[in-house]
């Protein structure tokens, strides 16, 4: 039964096996260009401002912000659709299996933060970066996992997707409560009203996407203006899309999954990678990794993440609180735990907010995030590759 229910998820990740390579190529090209004679063109293009709206109603954002706030809201919308279906009738419909990524995400946020704090004790300025290694870059971690294709069971891909979504929601909440300026109560109220309207559409069984899309677009605008990262609007919208078990492959949720998955896999994710992987390495050196900020981030991402996710998951399974994903081993779960240390763009984003008043630490953030994410990518990939052969 699970095999039949997971067909849409398998279908998407078969696409992802190809798109993971496209994403990796896009990231490498961006990194090369941003450290070449074309770097000014690259950064100037991303920093160009575009106005989208009607008359005075709209937003004027840089190309980079449109990609990170709008396109990634669509990405979060898609992966939340996937996870919602898995909670209703798939891999996560079993409570004990559903609890594992939730518990793992908590460990994956707390332990890296503790590692960073331990290394930066005594320095009130650098302690402000405690949340940097707590984030997971969902697009890159899934992209790396997808390179392994069918050698990784669908259940582990579901586990990583669910964990990364929870992780990123945690990061968004951390940003909202610890690093944001004043949150707008009026816009937060409008978000709540929008969400209630969406739930009402779901309650009355509205199966046309247009009403959801219109309200969702306004909710995205309200979310952006509220001071909370706008990608959360994609999660909220997806959570209200109707799906009933008896509808099988004909629900609005399933139709949307199939309709937008190739665009997410081959357009949105590569564009995101190209726009965010371009980090200038000028002035960075490996010796600077020994400084408290980069060392705390490096160890938080590469050590703290895998220890946090793996240890709490192991304890939860051994005490019967949670259940292992189907067809997975402890070694393969460990490999996925390492991949959660790919913090990359989310960690860089949190780092820029954490040290907005102390920009002298930004270079340290960059090298710490790049080193920690790279180590997590390489070790996670090869551990999973080895586990697939056993």
Curated annotation (Swiss-Prot):
Origin: domain of life: Bacteria
S-S pairs: none
Keywords carried by this UniProt record: Antiport, Cell inner membrane, Cell membrane, Ion transport, Membrane, Sodium, Sodium transport, Transmembrane, Transmembrane helix, Transport
GO molecular function, one term: sodium:proton antiporter activity
GO cellular component, one term: plasma membrane
Transmembrane segments: 13-33, 61-81, 99-119, 129-149, 158-178, 181-201, 209-229, 259-279, 297-317, 330-350, 367-387
Membrane topology value: Multi-pass membrane protein
PANTHER family (alphabetical): NA(+)_H(+) ANTIPORTER NHAA (PTHR30341:SF0), SODIUM ION/PROTON ANTIPORTER NHAA-RELATED (PTHR30341)
HAMAP family: NhaA
The protein's name in its UniProt record: Na(+)/H(+) antiporter NhaA
Lineage: Bacteria, Pseudomonadati, Pseudomonadota, Alphaproteobacteria, Candidatus Pelagibacterales
């Amino acid at each position: 039964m699970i095999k039949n229910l997971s067909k849409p998820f398998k279908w998407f990740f078969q696409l992802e096996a190809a798109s993971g390579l496209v994403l990796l190529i896009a990231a490498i090209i961006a990194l090369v260009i941003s450290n070449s004679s074309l770097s000014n063109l690259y950064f100037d293009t991303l920093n160009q401002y575009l106005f989208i709206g009607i008359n005075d109603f709209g937003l004027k954002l840089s190309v980079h912000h449109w990609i990170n706030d709008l396109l990634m809201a669509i990405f979060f919308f898609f992966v939340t659709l996937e996870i919602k279906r898995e909670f209703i009738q798939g891999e996560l419909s079993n409570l004990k299996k559903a609890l594992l990524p939730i518990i793992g995400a908590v460990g994956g946020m707390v332990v890296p933060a503790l590692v960073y704090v331990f290394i930066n004790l005594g320095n009130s300025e650098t302690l402000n970066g405690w949340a940097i290694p707590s984030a997971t870059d969902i697009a890159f971690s899934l992209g790396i996992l997808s390179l392994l294709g069918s050698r990784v069971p669908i259940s582990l891909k579901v586990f990583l997707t669910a964990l990364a979504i929870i992780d990123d929601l945690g990061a968004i909440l951390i940003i909202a409560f610890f690093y944001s300026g004043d949150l707008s109560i009026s816009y937060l109220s409008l978000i709540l009203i929008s969400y209630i309207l969406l739930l009402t559409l779901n309650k009355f069984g509205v199966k046309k996407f247009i009403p959801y899309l219109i309200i969702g677009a306004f909710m995205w605008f309200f979310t952006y203006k509220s001071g909370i990262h706008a990608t959360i609007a994609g999660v909220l919208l997806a959570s209200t899309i109707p799906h009933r078990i008896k509808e099988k492959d004909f629900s609005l949720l399933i139709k949307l999954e199939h309709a937008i998955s190739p665009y997410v896999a081959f357009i949105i994710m590569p564009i995101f990678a190209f726009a965010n992987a371009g980090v200038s390495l000028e002035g960075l050196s490996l010796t600077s990794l020994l400084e408290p900020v980069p060392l705390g981030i490096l160890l938080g991402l590469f050590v703290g993440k895998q220890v946090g996710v793996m240890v709490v998951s192991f304890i939860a399974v051994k005490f019967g609180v949670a259940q292992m994903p189907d067809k997975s081993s402890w070694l393969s779960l460990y490999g996925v735990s390492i991949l959660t240390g790919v913090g990359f763009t989310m960690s860089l984003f949190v780092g820029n907010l954490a040290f907005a008043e102390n920009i002298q630490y930004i270079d340290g953030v960059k090298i710490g995030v790049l080193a920690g994410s790279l180590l997590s990518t390489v070790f996670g990939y090869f551990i999973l590759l080895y586990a697939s052969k056993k």
